Amino acid sequence: MMKSRTRRALVLTGTAVAVSLALTGCSAINSILGGGRADADRDEETGQVTESANVDVFSVKLGDCMLETGSGMLTDANVVPCSEPHDEEVFYEIKMDDGEYSEDAISAASEGCIGDAYTSFVGVSYQESALDVTTLSPSKDSWEQANDRVIQCIIVDPAGQVEGSLKGAAR
């Protein structure tokens, strides 16, 4: 079953195992509502997180590893170096075309997280894998107010925290 979380509100959809976290608002709103800091400390060459930090949810980047984001209103995320125990890893991003906001279009595009991108990252198809997928997706507010068009595909091991990347895990 693919679930869908918004970055500020929980929304569930039905399909295999993906949770969509969608954005609502921009960094200024996050500051008002108590979101995390602007960004984590990162390696200048690789862009990888070098020190754990609670960051604004809009600062989450491809390759970031995070502690479980939970559900409900999400304004921030706890990013950690991938070498440390973590629950989630952003493994792919899907750029949506401009136009009117559509939950159906976002849900359909999110299916790309469990297709070829998943197989390329993990090494086996989603159907054969023991791993799950969540997505961080635009909400209506973030679409309209922050020009948010990116769906972030996030891989999760339902068995618990992992250390290191799940790239090539083949399970």
Predicted regions and their residues:
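Hydrophobic helical h-region of N-terminal Sec-dependent signal peptides
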Residues: 15-19
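C-terminal motif of bacterial Sec signal peptides marking the signal peptidase cleavage site
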Residues: 21-25
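Primary mode marks residue(s) on the alpha4-beta5-alpha5 output face of response regulator receiver
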Residues: 27-171
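Bacterial N-terminal signal peptides that target proteins for export
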Residues: 2-14
